[in-house]
Amino acid sequence: MNDNPFTFDKFPVGTHERLINGYWELGMMRFHTYTNECGEDLQSTYNRINNGLGVQTIYIDLLSLVGEDYRNKSQIMDVIQSNKPTWIWFINCEALLNDSLAGWIRSILTTYDTDHIRVTFVLDNQEQYSNIFQCYSAPLYQSTMALDLQKS
C-alpha cells in the first residue's frame, strides 16, 4: 500500500523533472537565481518540463513596469486572475530596487490566490540579491529560496 500522495518521486533523484514536479506538488512558490548560473539552456529545460505539465511559461521584464500604470493593468495581474498554471521568469530585477514596485509585487504575490503561479527572479549578481532580498527594510526581504540548478 502506497500512502504517498506525491508523484514527483517517480522521477530519479537529481533530475530536472523531479525538481520541477516537486516544486509544484509541494507548493514551493518563489525562487531566485542568477543569470550567469541559470542561462538560456537551463531555462529552456525548465520551460519544457513545465510545458509538459500543462504549465505556461512567461518572461516579465520588470523594467517595463517602471513608470507604467502597473497597479491597474499588467501582465502579472492577467496571469493571477486567469488561474492558469504559470511559471514566471522575472527579468531585469534591478527594477525591484524601487520600493514601490517591489512592495506591489510582494503584495500581489502574498494577498491574491497565487497557488497556480511559480515565480523566479533572475538576478544579475549577489549584490542585487542582497539589496532586494536580504535587506531587512526591503519589501521582498527573505521572500524567496534559491532555484535549484540540478546538473542532470
Segment roles from a protein language model:
Residues 37-44, 98-99, 127-131:
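Short, charged/polar "capping" segments at the starts of alpha-helices
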Residues 29-32, 58-60, 120, 141-147:
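Hydrophobic/aromatic beta-strand patches that form the interior of the parallel beta-sheet core
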Residues 131-152:
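A short helix-turn-beta junction within AAA+ P-loop NTPase domains corresponding to the substrate/partner-engaging
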Residues 44-45, 100-108:
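A short acidic, amphipathic alpha-helical/loop segment
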Residues 1-85:
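Extended, compositionally biased accessory segments flanking or bridging domains
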Residues 104-112, 135-139:
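Catalytic-core regions built around general acid/base machinery
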Residues 61-68, 72-104, 118-126:
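Conserved P-loop NTPase "ATPase switch" module shared by AAA+ and STAND
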Residues 52, 114, 139-142:
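Short, well-ordered coil/turn elements that cap or connect secondary structure elements
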